[in-house]
């Protein structure tokens, strides 16, 4: 976990084999991987320092404790960009990329993610090379003068709501509202998405493809 270069492999579920490997000189702890809904992109997260350090300060490198976004082209990983929640945090706020999930909006790639005491950030990575933040929530430090571990461990989207598990303060529940970045129709579509196969249950780590009701079916 202390290495700055780590390899990752992609697997086919029914017949696993390594398709490609990547390294990132800024990454310390390759923590998780999240595919977009159609499986053409993947987000890798770097939980720098195991999540217990302040790595979102104004002077911290933008590839420390960040996301790395890759397009999948001919079963190969092609690096496109890094993403780090943009608001600088205090030295008393542990802050790195952590658990999140896709918000299933047709023809777009939207990801909600926990950043410990950095709060939550909703990222639009439809353009893999230019990800942007389209929504956020940040409580501020638990203690202003002392760094203690806290903040969001995970933020998961499910049928219209974002559930944030805050280590010290409990569970927060959020609802998306229309904005210049998200329309009322897109928010409704995300709420109505369901698994392409199998029962209508949710486990963010399964990352099953989602589909939407056809027009006039509701």
List PLM regions with ranges.
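Structural signature of eukaryotic scaffold interfaces centered on beta-propeller domains
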Residues: 31-38, 48, 94-107, 151-158, ...
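Flexible loop/turn segments at secondary-structure boundaries
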Residues: 26-29, 50-53, 90, 119-121, ...
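Blade-level signature of beta-propeller repeat domains, shared across WD40, Kelch, NHL, RCC1
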Residues: 145-218
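Conserved blade-ending motifs and adjacent loop-strand segments that build the rim/top face
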Residues: 23-29, 82-98, 130-157, 194
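Single conserved hydrophobic/aromatic residue that forms the stacking wall/gate
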Residues: 1-12
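Loop/turn-rich, solvent-exposed surfaces of beta-rich toroidal or solenoidal domains
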Residues: 41-132
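A structural motif specific to WD40 beta-propellers
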Residues: 17-20, 78-80, 131-134, 182
